[in-house]
Amino acid sequence: MATELKKGPLPTDIEETVITIMREEGVRYITAKILRMRLESKYQMEFGPHKAAIDDIVARAMQRPEFKKQLELALKEKDASKSSGGKGSKRARSAGAEAPSKTKKEMTEKPKKPADYPKPAVSSYLLFVADQREELKAKNPGMQNTAILQTLGKMWSDASDDVKEHYRKKAEEDKARFRREVDEYKRQGGKEYGRGGKIKKDSNAPKRAMTSFMFFSSDFRSKHSDLSIVEMSKAAGAAWKELGPEERKVYEEMAEKDKERYKREMAALPK
């Protein structure tokens, strides 16, 4: 019997959780429905009333370089698939094709975590995947990685409350282990790092201002929740180009107000 979901305010770590889920599922495959199911599974609460807020978080997250690259690659592969009649694997490269080389900026921009930095905590979903992946591959030797991940995602969605609770407890234990190790690392003079090797920012810092296009994308997403993020971004981009000056002005004013809000909150921070 499924547990009845409670109602309540957004969790304080919701933005971090949304970004984690987007990383785990991938921009190519995640949809509003998958995101909502994952959030409801983690927090055991309804997220329907918070749809607009979640859309805003996704819009901001899509401005991150890691997700922009995923989106750009997915759109290129989708266009290439269409131009070639959709034949062959979307992920396949031609035999002579080489991966694009990184620029000096890309190679030097991000500071690397020290080798002795504590191993990051793993989410309940990834712990489940780690336990089930090899068994699934053994039973389906010819299954592609994409299909394996999609199957594992469905297995997780269909898993019983007891199974999910088991992995949630394991994830909480791992999170506590990571927190202890990071605290000890900091006591010894080290700095705390976030994902991607960047030094962790202040969690109390104001949220960055949204652009006019981000506000439009959030509005567009709320009306087309059946689309994947890749399809959504492409459709929103096309729709944005079709907007007239008066229609854009609405979103530009929203962006200007948010920019002023960000400036005020930054100015109010203790020096």
Swiss-Prot record:
Function: Unknown. May play a role in transcription and/or DNA replication. It is not known whether this protein is DNA sequence binding-specific or not.
Residues of the DNA-binding region: 118-186, 206-270
Pfam families, alphabetized: DEK_C (PF08766), HMG_box (PF00505)
Segments forming domain DEK-C: 8-63
Protein name: High mobility group protein homolog TDP-1
Ranges of biased composition (kind: Basic and acidic residues): 101-116
Region (Disordered): 75-118
GO MF term set: DNA binding
Gene3D superfamilies linked: High mobility group box domain (1.10.30.10)
One cellular component term from this protein's GO annotations in UniProt: nucleus
Originating species: Trypanosoma brucei rhodesiense
Domain of life: Eukaryota
